[in-house]
A protein has these predicted regions:
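Inter-lobe coupling linker of SF2 helicases/translocases
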Residues: 123, 130, 134-153, 168-183, ...
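Walker B catalytic acidic pair
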Residues: 58, 159-160
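Charged, low-complexity
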Residues: 1-53, 131-133, 138-139, 154-155
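Walker A/P-loop
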Residues: 50-70
């Protein structure tokens, strides 16, 4: 009898610990997690306290899985309205993966779906008791936010974020999304945070917090012209987390490619 009571107390404390732990969402994933994905998750939930993070693992290491883990954590923490901005070609893939791997229902919104079901969509977005995970293209993201400007978005995920790196001197879609999502916690995903120049990093980090590097002029003076790469690396640590394939070779198998000539 006493033994059963101790087991019940242990089970109660264990459940209470898991309920209060940020790691309980790791148990909800319908997948086998790799160590680097858990490390990325830990880095992300810490960074969300100060605005967000860029997860920049190399291709094939599961950034979408990492994003799903973080999304689960954010929802467990009380978030209700989540916007996922991504290339239009990836919307369906994300919808399927969120459902199959995390049991999360999402909706793809574009101009057509909004115009033809405006009342129902508006009702769902305005209902703060209901979770809404919205998948939409880069181009439509800003239009959606403007259309429902009274909606408070709790979290923003940007996939293939390098496409928006030229936020201050590129396409309007990057600048529009930057202006409209200021202050919203963000998760940026990209395998190539640095494509053409160091200023790519300035643009991406500015999405998280423009105060980190200041203006592009200041960034150029310190890092492009000054060449202080060690200081740049240190300042990136809290906002950029990257895993390379060579770091995970012990527990992940990659297919070998043969060049035929």
């Amino acid at each position: 009898m006493e033994s059963n009571l101790l087991l019940e107390q242990y089970s109660w404390y264990k459940k209470r610990y898991l309920d209060e732990s940020p790691f309980k969402c790791l148990l909800n994933a319908n997948i086998e997690l790799n160590p680097h994905q858990i490390n990325a998750f830990c880095a992300a939930i810490q960074a969300l306290k100060t605005g967000g993070i860029i997860l920049a693992d190399e291709v094939g290491l599961g950034k979408t899985i990492e994003a799903g883990l973080v999304l689960n954590y954010v929802l467990d923490s009380g978030a209700k309205k989540v916007l996922i901005s991504l290339p239009a070609t990836l919307r369906k893939q994300w919808e399927i993966e969120l459902l199959e791997k995390f049991g999360l229902h999402s909706v793809i919104l574009d101009r057509y779906t909004v115009e033809h079901d405006i009342s129902n969509i508006q009702h769902q977005l305005e209902n703060r008791e209901k979770v809404s995970i919205v998948l939409t293209s880069y181009d439509y993201s800003s239009k959606l936010i403007r259309r429902f400007r009274h909606i408070k978005w709790d979290f923003l995920i940007i996939d293939e974020a390098h496409n928006l790196r030229n936020v201050f001197h590129g396409t309007k879609r990057a600048k529009n999304l930057y202006d409209l999502t200021h202050g919203i916690p963000k998760l940026l995903l990209t395998a190539t945070p640095l494509q053409n120049a160091l200023t790519d990093l300035h643009g991406l980090v500015s999405f998280i917090d423009p105060r980190i590097f200041g203006s592009e002029k200041v960034f150029n003076r310190r890092f492009v012209e000054g060449g202080d790469y060690e200081e740049l690396k240190q300042e990136l640590l809290p906002v950029l987390y990257r895993t390379l394939r060579r770091d995970v070779g012990k527990y992940m198998a990659f297919s070998k490619r043969t060049c035929i000539t």
